[in-house]
């Protein structure tokens, strides 16, 4: 039996709001199970609400319920996975142009797995590019971080897959996104935190769009990371020529001027992407500027 619970929260002002309904499962022995990917205080309170609404004798959490067993998905399967997500906010070009970098990252580079997404020594990946979640969700599904059938629920009521990723709902997601210009500053903070904790093995990757450089927060983070020599940090910039402020000398020159190691690559070439991300950048942060076009993104899908 499934129990749907609406919980009303009241605040000091006397204002009450209705929290979105959650679905629970109740077994024959009366146990109420809330299928969650990450436990939180909200989950606990909702389970208690479910217990009050049915004759439950026990409450338990089933964590990582959205996760699936390791899969045999390949890069060739990504277009089909992306096509399962439908709606007016698909941002198809952004998804296709982001797909190659995301795939290489998760296929060859990061030290992170669905079995240990919260390991203290894991590599971290932050998606800052606001129009890239569909490709991100597809790659996470292909790599076992979430069940492929969840892609069919994208952007629907109660789906964990929103227009922007939510780190409280999806295993392996390090950053709740949506607002441009936040990814690089957050990644700088993560890299600095790892240094303070004397954790020097984990790497921090952040994917941003060139249009995000219209946000001043990125320039501040860029300057600080260069001065602090945060060599655990790698920034991938997808350059599709949409930055309204313009880059007459190239994005890489801006990073280079702040003390970063930089490299320019073809954002649809998997070998170039892998080589750049594995580049030895000694005691400096690394900026990988990946040029992408509508044609290269379209060809990348058609050729694989």
Swiss-Prot record:
Name of this protein: Ferredoxin fas2
Residues of the 4Fe-4S ferredoxin-type domain: 2-29
Keywords assigned: 3Fe-4S, Electron transport, Iron, Iron-sulfur, Metal-binding, Plasmid, Transport
Cofactor: binding comment: Binds 1 [3Fe-4S] cluster.
Cofactor(s) required for function per UniProt: [3Fe-4S] cluster
Job of this protein: Plays a role in electron transfer. The fas operon encodes genes involved in cytokinin production and in host plant fasciation (leafy gall).
Record InterPro entries: 4Fe4S_Fe-S-bd, THDP-binding, Transketolase_N
SUPFAM superfamilies in UniProt: 4Fe-4S ferredoxins, Thiamin diphosphate-binding fold (THDP-binding)
GO molecular function, one term: magnesium ion binding
Record family assignment: In the C-terminal section; belongs to the transketolase family.
Induction record: During the interaction with host plants.
Region: Transketolase-like, residue numbers: 66-304
Binding site residues for [3Fe-4S] cluster: 10, 16, 54
Keyword Iron-sulfur: yes
Organism encoding this protein: Rhodococcoides fascians
Domain of life: Bacteria
UniProt key word Plastid: no
């Amino acid at each position: 039996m499934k129990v749907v619970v609406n919980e009303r929260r009241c605040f000091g002002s006397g204002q009450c709001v209705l929290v979105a309904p959650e679905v629970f499962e109740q077994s024959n022995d009366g146990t109420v199970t809330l299928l969650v990917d990450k436990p939180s205080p909200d989950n606990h309170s909702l389970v208690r609400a479910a217990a009050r609404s049915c004759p439950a004798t026990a409450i338990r959490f089933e964590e990582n319920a959205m996760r699936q067993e390791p899969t045999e998905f390949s890069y060739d399967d990504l277009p089909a996975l992306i096509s399962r997500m439908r709606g007016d906010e698909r941002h198809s070009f952004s998804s296709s142009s982001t797909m190659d970098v995301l795939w290489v990252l998760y296929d060859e580079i990061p030290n992170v797995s669905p079995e240990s997404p919260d390991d203290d020594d894991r590599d971290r990946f932050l998606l800052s590019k606001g129009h890239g979640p569909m490709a991100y969700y597809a790659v996470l599904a292909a790599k076992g971080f979430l069940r492929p059938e969840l892609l069919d629920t994208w952007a629907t009521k109660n789906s964990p897959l929103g227009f922007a990723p939510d780190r409280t709902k999806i295993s392996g997601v390090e950053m709740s996104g949506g607002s441009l210009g936040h990814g690089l500053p957050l990644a700088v903070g993560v890299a600095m935190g790892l240094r303070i904790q004397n954790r020097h093995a984990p790497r921090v990757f952040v994917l941003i769009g060139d249009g995000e450089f219209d946000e001043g927060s990125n320039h501040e983070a860029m300057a600080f990371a260069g001065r602090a020599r945060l060599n655990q940090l790698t920034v991938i910039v997808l350059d599709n020529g949409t930055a309204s402020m313009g880059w007459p000398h190239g994005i890489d020159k801006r990073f280079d001027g702040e003390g970063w190691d930089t490299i320019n690559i073809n954002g649809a070439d998997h070998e170039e992407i892998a080589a750049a991300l594995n580049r030895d950048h000694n005691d400096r942060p690394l900026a990988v500027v990946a040029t992408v076009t509508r044609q290269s993104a379209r060809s990348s899908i058609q050729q694989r």
